[in-house]
Curated annotation (Swiss-Prot):
<feature type="region of interest" description="Disordered">
    <location>
        <begin position="151"/>
        <end position="185"/>
    </location>
</feature>
<comment type="pathway">
    <text>Protein modification; protein ubiquitination.</text>
</comment>
<dbReference type="Pfam" id="PF00179">
    <property type="entry name" value="UQ_con"/>
</dbReference>
<protein>
    <recommendedName>
        <fullName>Probable ubiquitin-conjugating enzyme E2 25</fullName>
        <ecNumber>2.3.2.23</ecNumber>
    </recommendedName>
</protein>
<dbReference type="GO" id="GO:0061631">
    <property type="term" value="F:ubiquitin conjugating enzyme activity"/>
</dbReference>
<dbReference type="InterPro" id="IPR000608">
    <property type="entry name" value="UBQ-conjugat_E2_core"/>
</dbReference>
<keyword id="KW-0833">Ubl conjugation pathway</keyword>
<comment type="function">
    <text>Accepts the ubiquitin from the E1 complex and catalyzes its covalent attachment to other proteins.</text>
</comment>
<feature type="region of interest" description="Disordered">
    <location>
        <begin position="70"/>
        <end position="99"/>
    </location>
</feature>
<comment type="similarity">
    <text>Belongs to the ubiquitin-conjugating enzyme family.</text>
</comment>
<feature type="active site" description="Glycyl thioester intermediate">
    <location>
        <position position="418"/>
    </location>
</feature>
<dbReference type="GO" id="GO:0016567">
    <property type="term" value="P:protein ubiquitination"/>
</dbReference>
<keyword id="KW-0808">Transferase</keyword>
<dbReference type="GO" id="GO:0005524">
    <property type="term" value="F:ATP binding"/>
</dbReference>
<keyword id="KW-0547">Nucleotide-binding</keyword>
<feature type="domain" description="UBC core">
    <location>
        <begin position="332"/>
        <end position="492"/>
    </location>
</feature>
<feature type="compositionally biased region" description="Low complexity">
    <location>
        <begin position="156"/>
        <end position="178"/>
    </location>
</feature>
Amino acid sequence: MEPNVVEIATPPAASCSRIRTPTKAETPEVIDVEEYDLQNGGVPNGNNVDYKNKGKAIDFDSMSYGDYGEEDEYAVGSPGDDYGYPESSPLSNSLLDPESLIYEDDENYSEQYDFEMEAEPDNYSMYQDLFDGKDIPTGVEVSMDWFPNSADKESASSSKSSHANNGNNSSKKATKASGIHSQFSSDMETPVAQPWNALPHKAEGVIPNSAYALPQNSKAFQPPYAVHYSALKTAFSNYLQPQTPDTVLGEAPAPAAGSSGLLPPNTPGFKSNAARFKEEPPILPPDDSRVKRNMEDYLGLYLFFKRFDIVEDFSDHHYASKGTTSKQHSKDWAKRIQDEWRILEKDLPEMIFVRAYESRMDLLRAVIIGAQGTPYHDGLFFFDIFFPDTYPSTPPIVHYHSGGLRINPNLYNCGKVCLSLLGTWSGNQREKWIPNTSTMLQVLVSIQGLILNQKPYFNEPGYERSAGSAHGESTSKAYSENTFILSLKTMVYTMRRPPKYFEDFAYGHFFSCAHDVLKACNAYRNGATPGYLVKGAPDVEENSAGMSSLKFRTDVATFVETVLLKEFILLGVLGLEPEEEEKTPETIIVAESSKCTRSRSKRDRVSSS
């Protein structure tokens, strides 16, 4: 059946940069409807191609979509179709467009299309003139796409759109990669590089050989903060004190002169070390939403707090991520851990409390109460322990809850515990971990006796030789003064954020010892030295250690009045507020009976149950 045809007058010729010479006489054309649509950007059905695309079509090879046969054709338009060949609009086609720099001969045009074309201009000369007019810097190369966009690259010089011809595969110049790229050309546009006029070449402030030519005065190159070594050193000294001389601990490395510029100034969470220590101190500002605690909520649980117990939730443990609950350990390893539990449950000293985890036998948590006569008196010091798979051939791993404070040469502010028994410090063979002989109980007792002692300054190797000398004792006293201030801060840190399963113990402990701590601070404010035995100790005038420094006395008084006293009041400690001066004798008895000198028989009875 003959297709329906319509006789249409020839439309006026559109302006074009090149003139086509039809192969037939200029007579009214008789075309079908599909041919008419073709002239307006439609799909060609034969060898004819729409006039908008300058008589060029793209040949798809065998790697085109599998849904179409070799004779199927489809086309996609693009905004680039509105422009003519580069002469019509010099900026319409970017010089960085990879399709605009493909030079191929045009000798087969007359064979592929049904109309004749005038002689094509010399592509090389045309683009050479175009490049010369753009004032491109010497040595700059135009980026080229690795995978060509089509089989006949000369067809993409102006339109950036893809049209299929009648499936003629006569051209063998297209690579297989071109077919791969053509599959996706109908779904997305080929990315076009940034035009040269948008790049600030030959401008001041541009970094030479920069990939993106960012000006040096751009905000991206400005340091996010000003770092001064003096300020950084002061910030570290405030939070890492006390410290032994630099010959032992080493001086903190000097900060960089500025930022690398990789992060913008206002990137969330981006802080320097100095800013982190200044803005996030261990002692956080008081929370106005906190309310005064009722001692009845925790005091009873504190009095019957077991010395050793097995609990469930290990989520806040420092080494919680080192293993899983489903991990299967060897029978020998599990048996050894159970032996450690039995030893701890039976032989723990009075001032050490331990919690094990039922679902994670490799984890342990312990708290040590600071002994009287030391700068650590009445404080609580928490440690997280991890038993590796190689235990007991290798020692356990211990982390101290420092809160960012370094209270001892062997307890780093990062949480590291420096001890020969743990393999974190050198020592003779008898001081190191001995497999199948050393125990976790030895580790805890060593921390209590060797680290949290009366004169922690002499914990550093070599410093003990200065003990007894005027210089050594003077330096040790200054170190102990700083240690006690940090111990007070650790108390506040623990009261505000006690570790899980130790909340009632921490509240009850500081409730019972609050008056003793305040009494000791009053003695220190009057000149007593740290570690001075307040309970039953002689007066300050009879203290053989001499007077404490003026700075220490001032620091103690300031911290107690501004921080510590308020924390004790929020804890519910009695007798610290003016309205509590008049109390009944029964209330006084309850407060006094809950001090640190709890009944030893009651503690042992609970532990043995």
